[in-house]
């Protein structure tokens, strides 16, 4: 079963192909896009060990010469050091502008490789082959590329659209359960921000998705990508509606920053927590019903995701430190705080100039000090 979803960006439009067996048929999808039959595959050591040879063989069978660059797994790779190392290795290979880079991995590999492609010789084409649920439904689509800095997540980056996204659902079979739950956080986000019917379907099918039922994954990934593709086509540079895709991310990134962007708290877990907090803060501000917030929280918790600060660690967080992280958020303008809040499940909006004292009081209620 193959589903193709177009991302309509005029001359830079591309397809997101979703289905099974796509890695083994990667050559037939990728070879026609190449000016010169040469690619560099960037992958981490874990994905490379499990699937790298399959992808390289599929490409070579289509007459494409391949080089493989291995990077360490984990968020720490998305750094200035990681970017410099990858850029140097691409230069050492002598890649030309007519060649292609393939990001074969999760969100970290996709973000890092996409940014390196954006700046390599002022821009080289790249393809996303996402290997995690989170990357398939979110980070591989839309052209956002970035690295982290000690001051925050994804603060240095560029918009650089891929030429193609291949989302092979078979590869999710080897994904650890924790990573699958992290991806589910981004799936349920789409229902919470703008599709109540999809949210209801997820309530009823969360276990089918997490048990990797193929039909459930086709629906979950397909609807998520449809929504993201539509929003990106309307607002590529996030000057308007695309900001809604950050539901849960401002709260979540703040907690990630305090936790050091490591494996103690993964990005999807932070987003799950952040969405629950966004609903509760919306209730506190008189924007959303407590019933909707409780229902959203229950749906997030059903996937085994954290919904409270105390789920992350027993020691309390500093409210002031969390607020300082939100001030570094990319949505912030004129020194004010900007959050994606909700009126109801399926009805999110961008709230500008959020009151710092109200936010601090809320975080104290949440257990911060």
Swiss-Prot record:
Which residues hold NAD(+)? 107-111, 131-132, 144, 153
Recorded GO molecular functions are: 3-dehydroquinate synthase activity; metal ion binding; nucleotide binding
Stored InterPro entries: Dehydroquinate_synthase, DHQ_synth_AroB, DHQ_synth_fam, DHQS/DOIS_N, DHQS_C
Q: What class of enzyme is it?
A: lyase
Q: Which GO terms describe its cellular component?
A: cytoplasm
Keyword Translocase included in the entry's annotation: no
Q: Which GO terms describe its biological process?
A: amino acid biosynthetic process; aromatic amino acid family biosynthetic process; chorismate biosynthetic process
Specify where it is mainly localized: cytoplasm
Q: Which reaction does it catalyse?
A: 7-phospho-2-dehydro-3-deoxy-D-arabino-heptonate = 3-dehydroquinate + phosphate
- Necessary cofactors: Co(2+); Zn(2+); NAD(+)
Residues at which Zn(2+) binds: 186, 249, 267
- What is the E.C. number? 4.2.3.4
Q: Which UniProt keywords apply?
A: Amino-acid biosynthesis, Aromatic amino acid biosynthesis, Cobalt, Cytoplasm, Lyase, Metal-binding, NAD, Nucleotide-binding, Zinc
Q: In which pathway does it act?
A: Metabolic intermediate biosynthesis; chorismate biosynthesis; chorismate from D-erythrose 4-phosphate and phosphoenolpyruvate: step 2/7
What's this protein's family per the entry? Belongs to the sugar phosphate cyclases superfamily. Dehydroquinate synthase family.
PANTHER family to which the protein is assigned, alphabetical? 3-DEHYDROQUINATE SYNTHASE, 3-DEHYDROQUINATE SYNTHASE, CHLOROPLASTIC
Instruction: Quote the protein name from its UniProt record.
Output: 3-dehydroquinate synthase
Organism, as annotated? Caulobacter sp. (strain K31)
Annotated gene: aroB
């Amino acid at each position: 079963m193959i589903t193709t979803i177009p991302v309509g960006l005029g001359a830079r439009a591309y397809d997101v192909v979703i289905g099974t067996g796509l890695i083994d048929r990667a050559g037939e999808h990728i070879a026609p896009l190449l000016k010169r039959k040469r690619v560099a595959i960037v992958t981490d050591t874990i994905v490379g060990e499990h699937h790298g040879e399959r992808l390289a063989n599929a490409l070579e069978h289509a007459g494409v010469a391949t080089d493989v660059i291995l990077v360490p797994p984990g968020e720490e790779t998305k750094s200035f050091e990681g970017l410099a190392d990858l850029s140097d290795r691409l230069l050492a290979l002598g890649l030309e502008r007519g060649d292609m880079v393939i990001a074969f991995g999760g969100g970290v590999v996709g973000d890092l490789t996409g940014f390196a492609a954006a700046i390599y010789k002022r821009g080289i084409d790249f393809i996303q082959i996402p290997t995690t649920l989170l990357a398939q439904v979110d980070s591989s689509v839309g052209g956002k590329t970035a690295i982290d800095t000690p001051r925050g997540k994804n603060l240095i980056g560029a918009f650089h659209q891929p030429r193609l996204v291949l989302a092979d659902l078979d590869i999710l079979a080897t994904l650890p359960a924790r990573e699958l739950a992290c991806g589910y956080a981004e799936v349920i986000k789409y229902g919470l921000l703008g599709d109540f019917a999809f949210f209801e379907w997820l309530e009823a099918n969360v276990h089918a998705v997490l048990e990797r039922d193929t039909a459930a994954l086709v629906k979950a990934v397909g609807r998520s990508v449809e929504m993201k593709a539509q929003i990106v086509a309307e607002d590529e540079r996030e000057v308007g509606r695309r900001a809604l895709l950050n539901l849960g991310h401002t709260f979540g990134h703040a907690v990630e920053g305090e936790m050091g962007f490591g494996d103690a708290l993964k990005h999807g877990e932070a987003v799950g927590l952040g969405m629950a907090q966004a609903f509760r803060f919306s209730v506190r501000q008189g924007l959303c019903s407590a019933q909707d917030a409780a229902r959203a929280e229950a749906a997030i918790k059903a996937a085994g995701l954290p919904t409270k600060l105390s789920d992350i660690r027993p020691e309390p967080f500093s409210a002031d430190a969390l607020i300082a992280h939100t001030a570094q958020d990319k949505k912030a303008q004129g020194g004010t705080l900007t959050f994606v809040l909700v009126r109801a499940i399926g009805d999110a909006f961008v709230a500008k100039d959020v009151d710092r004292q109200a936010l601090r009081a809320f975080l104290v209620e949440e257990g911060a000090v």
